[in-house]
Design a protein with these regions (language model features):
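Active-site C-terminal subdomain of aminotransferase-like
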Residues: 1-90, 170
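PLP-dependent enzyme catalytic core of the Aspartate aminotransferase-like
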Residues: 117-193
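Conserved PLP-binding catalytic core of the aspartate aminotransferase-like
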Residues: 69-137
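Short, well-ordered loop/turn and helix-capping segments at boundaries between secondary-structure elements
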Residues: 5-7, 19, 39-42, 86, ...
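Short secondary-structure junctions and interdomain/linker hinges
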Residues: 20, 24, 40, 44, ...
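Generic hydrophobic alpha-helical scaffold/packing signal
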Residues: 49-53, 60, 81, 95, ...
Length: 193
């Protein structure tokens, strides 16, 4: 991490975390941070960051069409937190089902969480990778539809224990079809790294 502060604040921070809570400086980490900060000075990065947020906002609006509840009603950054309490699947099962469909998401807790962190009520999605690939609104419309389809397909197995649920998902021809469609979309937007 990088902390920006005045000298007085740095002294207080150092007294509160040294020794034991903070390691020494790692030059490779510092170099990486410097390169990353240098990248942010390019106009292309500003465009990329802006498009990443636009993509997240558009994905929110598309998911809301399928009655997915977005925590806080929307987003102003690259992340989306979906409250799944109105859906049959919660975070752990839904994230795993999406994984088999080729869509990476994280189970996540949310404000006023009533479930355990091991099986939370929410799902977190991010848009940096789809933005890096060059995807925009038309592709996000497809992604939102696939997310909804995965929920609809896998809801029938909600009452199963996790291992049995996972076996149903990974042997589902419908999920395999979505995974193939996701892969085809990604092939049309290859990563240039």
């Amino acid at each position: 991490a990088l902390i920006l502060a005045n000298k007085e604040m740095i002294k207080k921070i150092n007294r509160s975390i040294l020794p034991g809570l903070q390691g020494g400086p790692f030059n490779h980490s510092i170099a990486g941070i410097c390169v990353g900060l240098g990248e942010t000075l390019n106009p292309e990065f500003k465009e990329y960051a802006s498009q990443t947020v636009k993509n997240a906002q558009f994905l929110c609006s598309e998911l809301q069409k399928y009655n997915f509840q977005i925590v806080s009603g929307g987003t102003d950054k690259h992340l989306i937190l979906i409250d799944l309490t109105n859906k049959p699947l919660l975070g752990k099962k839904f994230a795993r089902a999406l994984d088999y469909a080729g869509i990476i998401a994280n189970m996540n807790t949310m404000p006023q969480e009533k479930q355990s962190p091991a099986n939370p009520s929410a799902l977190r999605l991010g848009t940096p990778w789809i933005t890096t690939r060059g995807m925009k609104e038309s592709e996000i419309t497809l992604i939102a539809a696939w997310i909804n389809q995965v929920m609809e397909i896998c809801s029938q197995w909600n009452e199963l224990e996790f291992a049995d649920f996972e076996n149903k998902v990974k042997s589902s021809p419908e999920i395999a079809t979505i995974a193939n469609q996701v892969q085809e979309l990604c092939m049309n937007f290859p990563l240039e790294i």
